[in-house]
Amino acid sequence: MSVEATRMTRVQPSPSTVAAAKARELREGGARILDLTVGEPDFDTPDNVKRAGIAAIERGDTKYTAVNGTAALRSAIIGRLRRVTGIEYTDAEISVGSGAKHVIFTALMATLSPGDEVVIPAPYWVSYPDMVVLNEGTPVIVACPIEDDFKLTAARLREALTERTRWLILNAPSNPTGAVYTRAELAALAEVLADHPDVLVLTDEIYDEVFLGEGRCTSLLEAAPQLRERVLVVNGVSKTYAMTGWRLGYCAGPKDRVRAINKLQSPTPSCPSPISQAAA
């Protein structure tokens, strides 16, 4: 008799994690490996970040924090969002978790009911479908071919949406393609979403600073501020500051969604690492 829950039959180990483990094994065996498996920056965590983490340990900031992160970090996140996007958030609209992946998983857990659909443009980060399935949702994969620069078009989005659609996950800059949406493209997607007022949008912006073009990438809410009450913005420090192992991410969005995420944080990790929060 299997001791695993039946839901475990619907998911597989992350292909990128499996490939990363193999690359690590080969490297430890002396092979020279160019590792393109996971989103790991090729530079080290900045020294000032390391020093802030060490200082937190030395002054004893090693205890539980609030489930949604420290007030100081939430304030810093509000400041960054204001500075970068021009969007103003309140403290109640911010939550900090143990990595952007954890925040996304918790957001889906808090909002999906059995059979709810989540639209995922492809190519996609390999963890999205499994996170949806583990939370009893149904991934709806929408192919976005090279002819469309690997981006979701308004026409393809309209075709994918149904009365069961709960979320659209929009990852830009995209993992794995690096695709970035223009303001006009985002506005076109917003027009489609206007006809489906019950659909929520999760914008995964973890790569927003890993951008080689001119200027910077545009966030959906900058192009479509009217979606403010439907969009959950997810970001973190892993990619921009090479802090993948520090496990710290955050979200910004409507109070009711953030409140639900906080409710789930309490019985799961309790709180993000206080050392990582101080470093961030």
Could you tell me what each predicted segment is?
Residues 88-94, 114-117, 164, 228-231:
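Short acidic capping loops at alpha-helix termini that bridge into adjacent secondary structure
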Residues 130, 134-140:
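A short helix-loop-beta submotif of the ANL/AMP-binding
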